Amino acid sequence: MTDLTHPLERLVQRAEILMARIEAVLPQPMSAPDWNASIAFRYRKRSNGRGGLEPVRHVATLGLNDLQEIEGQKEKIQRNTEQFVNGLPANNVLLTGARGTGKSSLIKACLNEYAPRGLRLIEVDKDDLTDLPDIIDMVSEQPEKFMIFCDDLSFEDGEPGYKALKSILDGTVAASTPNVLICATSNRRHLLPEYMSENLTYKHTEDGE
């Protein structure tokens, strides 16, 4: 009788090697960082194409009282952030205006103001917005509140990041989670000027908020 033990073992070994190679190239679940390492994190793509959150070691110690001559915008953003950290309905935020008008500083000052109450910030580059569903899925069960921050945002026709962001806000890709707020800044009043009617649904005021 022919002994098939050794050929079968070799076949199993080859199958295991093949599966290991396949798993190496398949997308892996995003691993959570040490949430106690910082109040702010950056999303970064690694050389293998996988993304992850890196803690920001030195967060600017900017406070709301340090920001002058933008009292109207500051009051609205602070009120919206207050509602967010209290678990009440809050609006996603788009701050528009020329460079140097304090848009990013206002977001960072709110972070410092409300970090003791569990507010955290995750900065995501425009090119990585297609990974938003994975980021939201990772933080959805965390007790903290997360502002997902996109700085200096604008799109050209056909960019995948625009559709990804719009899908998140419309709830067509990932269900809205109560501990996630999208905050963005832009030099443009409309993120996609060519199709103003399809722009993201934000509430604008005359002061650019």
Name each model-derived stretch.
Residues T2-P55:
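Interdomain "pre-motor" coupling segment immediately N-terminal to P-loop NTPase/helicase cores
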Residues G87-A109:
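Walker A/P-loop nucleotide-binding motif
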Residues V59-E82:
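N-terminal pre-Walker A segment at the start of P-loop NTPase domains
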Residues L88-A90, R117-G118, E141-E144, S176-N179:
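Short loop/turn elements that form and flank the Walker-type P-loop nucleotide-binding site
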Residues L106-C110, D131, I135, G161-I168:
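Alpha-helical scaffold elements adjacent to nucleotide-binding pockets in ATP/GTP-utilizing enzyme cores
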Residues V56-H58, E82-A90:
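Phosphate-binding P-loop
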Residues E113-F146, D152-G158:
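AAA+/P-loop NTPase substrate/partner-engagement loops
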Residues S140-E141, D157-G208:
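Conserved catalytic/switch belt of AAA+ P-loop NTPases
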